[in-house]
UniProtKB/Swiss-Prot annotation:
One example of a Gene Ontology biological process annotation: pyridoxine biosynthetic process
Keyword annotations: Cytoplasm, Pyridoxine biosynthesis, Transferase
Organism expressing this protein natively: Ruegeria pomeroyi (strain ATCC 700808 / DSM 15171 / DSS-3) (Silicibacter pomeroyi)
Catalytic activity: 3-amino-2-oxopropyl phosphate + 1-deoxy-D-xylulose 5-phosphate = pyridoxine 5'-phosphate + phosphate + 2 H2O + H(+)
Pathway: Cofactor biosynthesis; pyridoxine 5'-phosphate biosynthesis; pyridoxine 5'-phosphate from D-erythrose 4-phosphate: step 5/5
Site description Transition state stabilizer, residues in chain: 155
Stated name of the protein: Pyridoxine 5'-phosphate synthase
SUPFAM superfamilies linked to this entry: Pyridoxine 5'-phosphate synthase (SSF63892)
């Protein structure tokens, strides 16, 4: 049986982080998105946080106008963000947890605690044609809850796996990888499309990319950092190559 093409979503948030460190127009996240397309990205991910610390409303406007690949719009489950998503109608909306004090998204959404609210929150997004994804830990209870609320997609948080690898804690790394494998298969059995991301690097991407149920990986911070040394196009192209190699 042939394994489906594994999509690469390139997150451009931290191009905006560099821009906002000084202000002004450069580097331009939209230019980065166009380069990502040329380098093999199948989609672009951008997280409009409530505090606008990196991506801005104007960036979302520009991305919607400029992209020839789908936009995956990451956002918190707030009324403000829902209104923005309903106005733009991006291809995909990924609901993520958000805390003002965090540097980056620290964990998965606790769907099981907020099933009723989240079910009502995502319904209008689905009605206008957005594919709704929920960013969760590799936990059976959260996968089941995401399915019950009507999400079409889950994105599994790979951060614990990547952190354990970076720290040299290979027992934990292998345990986290097995949890990702099991929950990918379980979610797929429920009819959910499976994505994964957070903290993936050249060293950690291939074991996750090899899971046949995973249809998309969203990768950002590492690629933007690697671009300093080898350029954005080559950095993304190498990630694309590693993903394809793992899937072969």
């Amino acid at each position: 049986m042939s394994v489906p093409h594994l999509r690469l979503g390139v997150n451009i948030d931290h191009v905006a982080t560099v821009r906002n460190a000084r202000g002004g127009e450069y580097p331009d996240p939209i230019r980065a998105a166009k380069i990502a397309e040329q380098a093999g990205a199948d989609g672009i991910t951008a997280h409009l946080r409530e505090d606008r610390r990196h991506i801005t409303d104007a960036d979302i406007d520009g991305l919607m106008a400029a992209l020839s690949v789908p936009l995956n719009f990451e956002m918190a489950a707030t009324d403000e963000m829902q209104k923005i998503a309903l106005r733009h109608k991006p291809h995909a909306v990924c609901i993520v947890p958000e805390k003002r004090e965090e540097r980056t998204t620290e964990g998965g959404l606790e769907v099981a605690r907020e099933e009723n609210r989240l079910a009502h929150f995502i319904a209008p997004l689905r009605e206008v044609g957005c594919r709704v994804s929920i960013f969760i830990a590799a936990d059976r209870r959260q996968v089941e809850a995401a399915h019950r609320i009507g999400a079409q997609v889950i994105e599994l948080h790979t951060g614990a796996y990547c952190d354990a690898h970076a720290e040299g804690d290979f027992a934990t790394r292998d345990r986290e990888l097995e949890a990702l494998r099991e929950m990918s298969a379980f979610a797929h059995s429920l009819g959910l499309e499976v994505h994964a991301g957070h903290g993936l690097t050249y060293d950690t991407v291939q074991p996750v990319a090899a899971f046949p149920e995973v249809m998309e990986l969203n990768i950002g911070h590492f690629l933007i950092g690697e671009a300093i040394f080898r350029g954005l196009h080559p950095a993304i192209a190498e990630m694309r190559r590693l993903m394809d190699e793992a899937r072969a």
